């Protein structure tokens, strides 16, 4: 396939193909936006004729996503859930609370936190996604959760603050598996609380952002 051969009919056919695969509207829009960006770059490099633009007047509407944020009061209910017989669910509860208290810290950043990230009364780390350095005050509630798992982590020889990843340098596939398991447990917690939408690590982040804007 050559970009110079791209025309409006092919774009429409591609949209139809993606929709036929059962992809959500926003996912289809992401694919088309990426294709359009690539085509625009080719235009700038004079690799395709600028006289014809296959995306002209093509409106990509984003589907309205369900409101995902939950009120801060629900995190108090989550903290009170008793799951002494299921340490993995208990861990997911603790991680969701820690994320909310840590200004919506992403799961990936929590997973890779080590004792070296603790500087006095602050957490100093780099965002896994952007590399940006973050300095965050460790509140008493956050410190309580860190201490809860400290002895267990030392006993296993792990420098990570939380028992999400095995000691050493786990591969990305291991992290993705841990994230999937975490979200599956959060979904069960959300069902227990009868939340209208699935409860995930993203919901935790979105909830903190919504509270911060109040």
Model-derived regions: residue spans:
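Short, basic/aromatic-rich helical patch in the C-terminal catalytic core of site-specific tyrosine
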Residues: 11, 35, 98, 110, ...
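Active-site/catalytic core of tyrosine-dependent DNA strand-transfer enzymes
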Residues: 75, 140-196
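Short, basic (Lys/Arg/His-rich) helix/loop patches that form interaction surfaces
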Residues: 84-87, 183-214
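DNA breakage-rejoining catalytic core of tyrosine-based enzymes
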Residues: 4, 48, 61-80, 132-139, ...
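Conserved tyrosine-mediated DNA breakage-rejoining catalytic core shared by Y-recombinases
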Residues: 5, 112-148
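Short, charged phosphate-coordinating catalytic segments
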Residues: 40-49, 99-120
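N-terminal core-binding DNA-recognition domain of tyrosine recombinases/integrases
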Residues: 1-66, 81-84
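Basic, Lys/Arg- and aromatic-enriched nucleic-acid-binding interface segment
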Residues: 52-107, 111
């Amino acid at each position: 396939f050559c970009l110079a051969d791209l025309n409006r009919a092919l774009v429409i056919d591609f949209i139809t193909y993606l929709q036929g695969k059962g992809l959500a509207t926003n996912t289809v829009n992401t694919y088309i936006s990426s294709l359009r960006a690539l085509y625009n770059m080719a235009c700038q490099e004079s690799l395709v004729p600028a006289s014809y633009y296959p995306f002209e007047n093509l409106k990509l509407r984003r589907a309205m996503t369900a409101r995902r944020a939950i009120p801060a009061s629900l995190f108090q209910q989550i903290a009170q859930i008793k799951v002494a017989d299921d340490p993995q669910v208990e861990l997911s509860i603790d991680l969701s609370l820690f994320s909310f208290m840590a200004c919506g810290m992403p799961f990936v950043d929590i997973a890779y936190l080590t004792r070296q990230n603790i500087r006095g009364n602050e957490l100093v780390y780099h965002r896994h996604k952007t590399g940006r350095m973050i300095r965050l005050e460790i509140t008493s509630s956050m410190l309580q959760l860190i201490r809860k798992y400290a002895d267990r982590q030392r006993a296993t020889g792990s420098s990570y603050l939380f028992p999400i990843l095995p000691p050493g340098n786990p591969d990305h596939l291991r992290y993705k598996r841990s994230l999937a398991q975490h979200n599956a447990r959060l979904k069960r917690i959300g069902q227990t609380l009868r939340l209208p939408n699935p409860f995930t690590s993203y919901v935790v982040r979105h909830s903190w952002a919504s509270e911060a804007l109040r």
